[in-house]
Amino acid sequence: MEPSKFHSTVLARPPGMYDEDDDHRRRQRDILNPPAPSQTGPGSGGSSSAGGPRPPFSLRSPTQSEFHHQSSQHHYSASSAASGPQSTYNGANNGVPQSHSHSRSNSHSRHSSSSVLHSPYQQASTASRPAHALDLHRSPQTSGLQAPQRSPGLHAPSVYYSQESREHHPPPPKPIDKPASSGRSFYDPLTDTTTTSTSDRERRTSDAGSSWHNATTNAVSTPTHRDAYNSYSKPAANPSPYYGNGKYTSPSASIYPPRSPASHPQSVATAAAEPISPPTRPPRMATPNILNPTTTSSMAAMSQAESPAQKAAVPAATPSRAAELMSFSNILSSSEPAPKPRPRSPVLAETPNKQPEPEPEREPTKEPSKEPSKEPSKEPSKEPSPPPADMDETSDSPACPEKPAEVDAETEPDAEIHDDVDTVDGLEESEKPEPPIKREKSAKVEKAPRRPRVVEKEKKERVTKAPRKSAGAKGRASEVKAESTPKQSRRSSGKQEALSSSRVPAKRQANGLTKQKAQALEQEKAVVAEMEQLEEEALDESEARAELRAFKKRKLNRQKALETTDLSVATELLPSLKDEAINRHHRRHDFSAEMVLKLGVHVALGRLRFGDHNYDAALKEVREQELFAEKERKKDMQRKRRREKSMAVTIEQKEAALAKAHATEDKLERQKLLREAERANKKAQQTKLILQKGIKGPARNIMPMDVNLEGGSMATFSADSMEPGKGKGKGRAGNRPKKSKEQKQAEKEAAEAAQAALDAGQELPSKEENPKIRIKVNKGKLSKDKDRDVDVDTIDGDNTEIKDTEEPPPKKKGKVVEEVKDTLETRFQSKGYNQIYDQIWRDMARKDVSKVYRLATDSYYTKASNLKKTAILAAKEAKRWQLRTNKGMKDLQARGKRVMRDMMTFWKRNEREERDLRKAAERQELENARKEEADREAARQKRKLNFLISQTELYSHFIGKKIKTDEVERSTDRPEVAAEEQKNKPAGENALTVKEPTGPVGAKVTNFENLDFDAEDDETLQAAAMANAQNAIAEAQRKARNFNNDDEPDEDGEMNFQNPTGLGDVEIEQPKLLTATLKEYQLKGLNWLVNLYEQGINGILADEMGLGKTIQSISVMAYLAEHHDIWGPFLVVAPASTLHNWEQEIKRFVPDLKIVPYWGSASDRKILRKFWDRKHSTYKRDAQFHVAITSYQMVVSDVAYFQKMKWQYMILDEAQAIKSSQSSRWKCLLSFHCRNRLLLTGTPIQNNMQELWALLHFIMPSLFDSHEEFSDWFSKDIESHAQSNSKLNEDQLKRLHMILKPFMLRRVKKHVQKELGDKIELDVYCDLTYRQRAYYANLRNQISIMDLIEKATLGDDNDSGTLMNLVMQFRKVCNHPDLFERADTSSPLALVRFAETGSFAREGNDVTVGYTTRSVVEYILPRLLWRDGGRLTKAGSDNPSAGFRSRYLGEMMNIWSSTNIRESVDGTDNFSFLRFADTSIAEAEKVGKTDLFARASELAQRRNRLANMHVSYDDDEEDNFTPAHALFLIRQRQDRTALSEITSEGALQNLMNVSHVMYEDANLPRMDQAARPGASAPPIEVVCHTSSTQIERDRVLFNVPMRKALFGPNLDEQKEFVLQKVPVEQLPPAPLLPKPDNERQRFTSITVPSMRQFITNSGKLAKLDELLFKLKAGGHRVLLYFQMTRMIDLMEEYLTYRNWKYCRLDGSTKFEDRRDTVHDFQTNPSIFVFLLSTRAGGLGINLTSADTVIFYDSDWNPTIDSQAMDRAHRLGQTRQVTVYRLITRGTIEERIRKRAMQKEEVQRVVITGGAGASSGVDFSGRRAPENRNRDIAMWLADDDQAELIERRERELLESGELDKVAKKRGGGKRKKVAKDMGDGGGVSLDEMYHEGEGNFDDNKLSGAATPNVPDSTDAKPGKKKKATGKKAKTTKQRLAIADGQMDM
């Protein structure tokens, strides 16, 4: 088949503009890189290289106009790496036949359907079609592959241009010898613009440098088959390396899918777009190695099938032609940055004339070009690499047959595969090598000069490398390496191509005209630099995998979309094509899968070949590195030996200097020697340090620091490297030259020889006469610089003569020849000229000559003086060597002294070392003895502690057998829960194996000194512990029996409290005195309490809050009264907020008990004490009182009176109030005479274990006494796990539970209460607003991490206050920024004067301030004008004429009088118009006599009667009807009121007033104004300082009728009008003033803060607002807890704005108001929100009517929040309780909440036990009170800072710094602080944290109910303290003053 007649089977070829001959010529030229004439003979077989067939992709220049962009689809360059989606399109859609219309066939109808999917391979069927090969080389004009030629910039699609321009074809190529343009434009893929370049060298690159699908230079190029709309390629098994051809490439394709025919209906859109944008990376299914192919023998066969003329027409190397404007190669070569030449790699050299044997035909697979030169050559070429053959200017001539092409050396080494596909199909995956690594760029050849030709000498110098044969499949690949074609770098070839070839100007517009230069060179260089940067960037492997996965996912999606699109398009175009489209899709899919497998094989072969090529070079490089490392090691050893020798010498010098210093008696000499010894010692230490640690890094390669020429001392350079400066002496200029070591040694030897000669009595040898140095000095003036230019070194050392370079030339003596004068000079030879000339010379001789002579003389004397000084100095310098000869004797003496000093130093050092060793041995013995003693003491203390714990365990064991607390705890109302928990517990978990005593009870051990814990064995200690436990039990029972010794025992022998031992197993029923019904768990709790009472043992009832601890305590009192006739006295001590609750509960449940509410003033309490009967220890039913209820504060204040009473039972509610054993409360209550004590608490552990120890010590002081060991075990040992953040020892926890069991009973709600609803806790996270973030960041920036760490570790109490202050500021920011600064009401600048008063006391209760503002500008009128006749109309004594005018002119002669009007109304008189104006005479007279405002008011009230009349007579016949009395009132008669005014209701009103309705609906009248005036002022007034003036002014301003007329009646008046049923006729008229535009602001400019902005300024408040709306809609009632009273104030404003009812209870609420407030909330369902402070509302009150609890800010102590939420979740609550906790995300609140959760977990584990002990508990949230700084600092610090604090604390602990600080502070201070903490005088962490809430304890109760009596144990009871002067107030008092709870 003819090449020109071959067409696609689907699409017709578009017509071209050239004839068939021209097409044939262009096809011949299009055959890329044909073989040289000498190699294209029959024997060559069409092969271009000696070693292999011609590749389908070649190294042809991209500057050729017919360069096919299909072949450049794998054109991989730096520009294509960043080309974007267009590049992806160009590179991913090639080779699929088109089935769409011919209008889109210009770029896609290249081949038939048998072409390959954008793959360089074809199926086997294509090899047998020669016409196919011919069709591959059609010209772009005939194949339609290129769009109309335009400028190489980025253009719109071809559809954008007209049909004429699209059908226009490019002109024929320009001659090759045309000079290149100075500037050229290229497409910039980074900025999507066309960039102009002026440097042709930087812009033009070869096809080898810009494409990576090249083979040998003489190979024939076969363009790739295109099928544009096939599916995506599949990724290769081994992905391509990230750096192909030295450039960076992303491992994943672009995210843009290829264009489909369905999505792009334009006819030539894709055809125009393809050559514009450079192609992208190669297809993903093949590595870049495969995409650098060479052709197979089938391609060779294709080229052989062509005509001989075709072969002859193609030169050996394709010349560089002028690029077409829109050729893809032009764009691509222009867009690539300037290449950097690479070093050449060694290649195999062969004879160029050797012809390879033709290979058999095979599949036309495209194989990568051969690249054996991966590694750089051993000797990089110093000459620039020659250009390739196809770049040679003469390469198109047949006269160059010997010049072989050079293959690029920069592509991948596996770039050429000549193996058959069938040969390598069976290659194993394991044999495939890894992808190559990116090579280093070589920049050495970058600046080489350009060379136009290839140098043959350079080829001969190539290193010959023997091929390495591999077995099997590698045989063919290794044969390829025998190619004789020399290789060169692509980069270098690209540069040479740019040098050797010229190009036509590429700056052209769309019409073909030359485009003006518009871009700068800097822009192109910036793009090139950006591309190079992209090349050097590395891609992370994880990112590559992620991109690969994303690309695979997009590929599958795109495949599905394309399948659907193809089917839909085919079905729409022609239904019959549907099956064909489906078959085509299957064929493409199968073929692409097959090609993937084949390409994978070639990838493996390429990798193996790469290993073959680079193995020797790599081995050589490794050997060189090893050799270099060995050399460096030897050098290091030499340096080490030199340093050791130097150190030894330096040490000897140091010892010698020290010996001399000790021996000498001269103080200055000794100091000098000591300094020398110190320097030597320092030098030796430095050398020793270097020898030990070594110099880090290659110190030998580090250059010394830069020379400091600006002064200072540096030891890294010599002085002669500096510029000459000022000398040290006055007569010295510059520094003395530094002598070398040889010179110094020579001088020293000469001096020693001279000294020896003198000592021997010989004469000194004569000094050798050196040639004198003559310095010739010009007599003329020399500069100082030239004087200093004499080389001093030359003068000293070299015997050379220095001559002045500026010696004046000798004067020539001879006859003076008179010169010929100029004509201009002869012109001035006149008499006048000569006179002037002579005068000038005379003046110079008289004035200037003497001056010049003096200057010359001074200069001469100065020079002579300098020369004399120089000569003297030189003489001194010359004689200096003679002075040195006298130093020999001195050196000998000094040497002797030095030896003596060295000996003394040695013996002293020896003695000192012996003495130090002896002392060290003694210290070690003492230390060992101290350690042994410490170990013995620790063992003793451990045994003592074990003894104490065992004693307590035994006591608990004996009591527990009688009390059976464990059974009571396990028995619940929910047996299924208890059974499940019991099942989870191991058998005998807390069982204590105790051998019961059988003999008599042993003696109690009270003095621990009697026990020898070292000698005693365990059995003796166990027996002592058992004896102590039994004695403790007996003692408790004895005390219980002997409590009332005065009472006689019951004769009947009834079981009462005196004989209680028989009640251990008795089941107690509910007392009948109790009116309520106890629940099962409450009845069991009563049994437990009664058993404790019977045994005389105190206990702790620690049930969870809300389970009825109060009713159980009351039932105990009822039981004692009913069964044992013990009616008291009972003492109940409770917090002040629960006193009323206790009184109500006792009256309600046991009304027979008489109550004394012991609170109030001192006189009230005195009266109440009269009811106390101190004579009897037990009360009967008829006693005056049975129960006394008081508060903790009252107990402390009246401790003397309480101690006199004997209390049967003392109940302490909320017993955590006595958590400190050092507090006055604890001591006072412990001193009371009580038979039994009962502690009620829901949280036995709030902060630390010391609190639990205080409670246990309180209930059993005889057992839990103040032994330090036991206290330490409770607080320190257990809490040491908090410091180490470790797990709590399970054995210790078990022993702790065993101790607590008998004395403490605790049940939780989920076990005992079935009907109680669930409690759900939710954390609601809020974000900071912009204002809050700004505040928070400012506060954060003020914190210094170092200060924070220091205060956290070593801080004192003052630091605690500072840190807590920071915490408070952060909490304020999180709550609301208005806590810092409120948004105030604002107004314009008021330029007014306000009224002032001297004293409000004289003003009365009300002060009138109306119209008291005055303008700053006043119009002052004198009284003469205002009052004394100034106003002519004002009658007075000074103006008698005013009455005359008023009388005669205003009354008698007034024309508006009724008489005058009546006389003038007839006929044509003046007032005759009245009868036609509907006006009566009286109305006319009234108009003339009333003022303007009255007339306006009257007119506003008058109704238009004529308009209504006009409506009544509105007939066609009576159009002109007009009443006779209203002929002149034309406007009133025709005045029809608009419908919008008369329609005031109904739908018609909205329709007729659309604008008004829309204005109202848009809420515009109530919006805040966007702007306001800058200033305001009242109007200017006339001011006259008289009383009459003020009266007249007030008469106008306070004119009530005028105000009513202007503003109308107010709301109250309107309401009264309706209530009084005022007739409509009597209602006042509408106001004359219009309504204000803004209803909120009205007529004022004062701006009130917006509540909406108030809500949105806080993230918490905004979230709370949203939450409250939902709760209100759901019918819930809310308890809202705060920790700052100021925040409660803000919340009150918010609730008022929302119009929700609320009530408030906080620390400032009076004691008598608390009960009423709680009662109102419980009984009034309309109250939606109850505002409480966490501490005030968390104790004892019942708020079960609420079912929602919201914590606006959480507490750092979880027990406080638990108490607060249990106000609603307690007995009586029937609904589910939901607890919301607002937490600001990423702030201090999150860390406070985290610490609180840790603390809560600790409490759960310690009290309840369970799984927490084994799972590990984080105790890091708890610290001792003295370490509270750390707790606060942990809130402030983030995670990194917290780690630093802990690390610093560990360092201080290890170094003992903490102990030193503790000792420094002193133990007395700690005791005082502890006492203050207990008494309340100090500030605890709780009080500091809640400083914004006020006081909530009993220290301050408002009102007269409970006065404030200070807590103090120091003052004796009954005595008052003396009044002192002004005393500094505590922090607590200052807070109380700030909250208004305390007076100043």
From Swiss-Prot:
Compositional bias ranges of the Basic and acidic residues kind: 356-382, 429-464, 740-751, 782-791, 800-815, 966-986, 1887-1900
InterPro entries: DBINO (IPR020838), DEXQc_INO80 (IPR031047), Helicase_ATP-bd (IPR014001), Helicase_C-like (IPR001650), INO80/SWR1_helicase (IPR050520), P-loop_NTPase (IPR027417), SNF2-like_sf (IPR038718), SNF2/RAD54-like_C (IPR049730)
Domain named DBINO: residues: 840-965
GO cellular component: Ino80 complex
Coiled-coil parts of chain: 506-563, 624-696, 908-953
Protein EC: 3.6.4.-
Entry's Gene Ontology BP terms: CENP-A containing chromatin assembly; DNA repair; DNA-templated transcription; regulation of macromolecule metabolic process
Feature: compositional bias, Basic residues: 101-111, 727-739, 1862-1873, 1918-1932
Region (Disordered): 1-518, 715-815, 966-1003, 1862-1944
GO molecular function, one term: histone binding
Catalytic activity from the UniProt record: ATP + H2O = ADP + phosphate + H(+)
Gene3D superfamilies tied to this protein: P-loop containing nucleotide triphosphate hydrolases, Tandem AAA-ATPase domain
Composition bias, Polar residues: 84-98, 139-149, 208-223, 289-307, 327-336
Pfam families hit by this protein: DBINO, Helicase_C, SNF2-rel_dom
Domain Helicase ATP-binding: 1090-1262
Cited PROSITE patterns: DBINO (PS51413), HELICASE_ATP_BIND_1 (PS51192), HELICASE_CTER (PS51194)
Cysteine pairs bridged by disulfides in the record: none
UniProt-annotated location(s): Nucleus
Major localization class: nucleus
Domain Helicase C-terminal: 1663-1818
Assembly and oligomerization: Component of the INO80 chromatin-remodeling complex.
Function: ATPase component of the INO80 complex which remodels chromatin by shifting nucleosomes and is involved in DNA repair.
Domain notes for this protein: The DBINO region is involved in binding to DNA.
Protein name, UniProt field: Chromatin-remodeling ATPase INO80
